[in-house]
Amino acid sequence: MQCDFVDRILNEYDLLNAIVYRSKFTHEVKVGDVIIGGNNPIVVQSMALGGSGDVYQDAREVLELAQAGSELVRIAINSDKAIKSVPYIRDVLINHGFNSKMIIGCGQYEIARLVKQYPECALALGKIRINPGNIGFGDKRDKNFEDIIEFAIKNDIPIRIGVNWGSLDKYLAAKLMHDNSLRGTPDPDYVVLRKALVISAITSAKHAEKVGLPANKIVISCKVSKVRDLISVYTMLSKICDYPLHLGLTEAGSGVKGIVGSSAGISYLLLHGIGNTIRVSLTQQPGESRTNEVKLCQEILQSIGLRNFSVQVTSCPGCNRTNPKYFHQLVSDVNKYVADRMSVWKSANPGVENMTIAVMGCVVNGPGESKHANLGISMPGYGERSVAAVYQNGEKLCTLEGNNIFEQFVSIIENYVSIYYH
């Protein structure tokens, strides 16, 4: 009887997992070689800091983001010089083997003028992002919006309609706040603002369709700076539209705060089948590269099992059973070795990004965790025999000892990669 009960619970759990991990249907939007939406992999995006005034430096930054793994890179189109630099940046990317349409132009009220004034430069963009909250003001707002949409229609360029919590259409927000105040039991302000974001995005997308832009040329986003608001807004969006959704926590902050907030919000939504492309927006430390944002996007997707980008190294934190001097050094060395070798492996050994390696500190969980990985090594803890057991595909392969355990293990890793990924 107890066994039947457990089986029933497990069956219900499996069904729940199947529901949670099933992506919601959306249109497919093609941006050059990249497809956003449908059943396609979640797309990693980033944004160049730019603003150097040096087109060569700006191109190097975009190239660096692409080489780090960003599949689409957004740049600010806020001046004549900025839009005139796009063809050069595109050519740099093409010369390095990247998608010719991976640049996204992001502009505010000035972008309508720039696109009209420099159409040949704008044609080098793969996608254009516009913000309904500041595309224009007063009687210029709709005209600017429609000018961009008509340019996109004429030149087969997709559009992201990106609403931002910090630049929400003030007229829409004021109207909804006023209407809410007349209710018998008004909603809290944050609820009204969430609804305003969704309404702004959807009405703008429908207006773009009315002008003539096909639904499969539209991506939408509603950026907020708090995790609960992000989840609420995108859950609403997912229920009422079939446009692909661009996820991200705007103004996430820096350091651990930004990493945790972005990871929590994006992961929750993706695990509920919501979202088709992601960007992590972190405030960088002085001199820090924005490639960290790309790596974080990749780590989010890999940690929740949606995409693999690199060999996964699993390791325990260590405790008073482990020898920190040797164990922590081995973990560091293996991680560095894998990072250094990934570009070579990925070009010569297809599928290697799906490989897992376990580096464990003692006999308590070491052998078990190592057996779950493709390759694993269990170091001796205090009081254990001074040998390291190595496991391959769930079976014990050998034991290593001496002062060059790292070098011996690396040789085993290289041999495994050459045999199983070719």
Curated annotation (Swiss-Prot):
Its cofactor is [4Fe-4S] cluster. Keywords: 4Fe-4S, Iron, Iron-sulfur, Isoprene biosynthesis, Metal-binding, Oxidoreductase. InterPro entries: Dihydropteroate_synth-like_sf, IspG_bac, IspG_bac-typ, NO2/SO3_Rdtase_4Fe4S_sf. Its EC number is 1.17.7.3. It catalyses: (2E)-4-hydroxy-3-methylbut-2-enyl diphosphate + oxidized [flavodoxin] + H2O + 2 H(+) = 2-C-methyl-D-erythritol 2,4-cyclic diphosphate + reduced [flavodoxin]. One of its GO terms (biological process) is terpenoid biosynthetic process. GO terms for molecular function: 4 iron, 4 sulfur cluster binding; 4-hydroxy-3-methylbut-2-en-1-yl diphosphate synthase activity (ferredoxin); 4-hydroxy-3-methylbut-2-enyl-diphosphate synthase activity (flavodoxin); iron ion binding. [4Fe-4S] cluster binds at residues 316, 319, 362, 369. Binds 1 [4Fe-4S] cluster. It holds the Pfam family GcpE. Gene3D superfamilies: Dihydropteroate synthase-like, Sulfite Reductase Hemoprotein, domain 1. It comes from the Bacteria. Pathway: Isoprenoid biosynthesis; isopentenyl diphosphate biosynthesis via DXP pathway; isopentenyl diphosphate from 1-deoxy-D-xylulose 5-phosphate: step 5/6. It is an enzyme of class 1 (oxidoreductase). Converts 2C-methyl-D-erythritol 2,4-cyclodiphosphate (ME-2,4cPP) into 1-hydroxy-2-methyl-2-(E)-butenyl 4-diphosphate. Belongs to the IspG family. This is 4-hydroxy-3-methylbut-2-en-1-yl diphosphate synthase (flavodoxin). The gene is ispG.
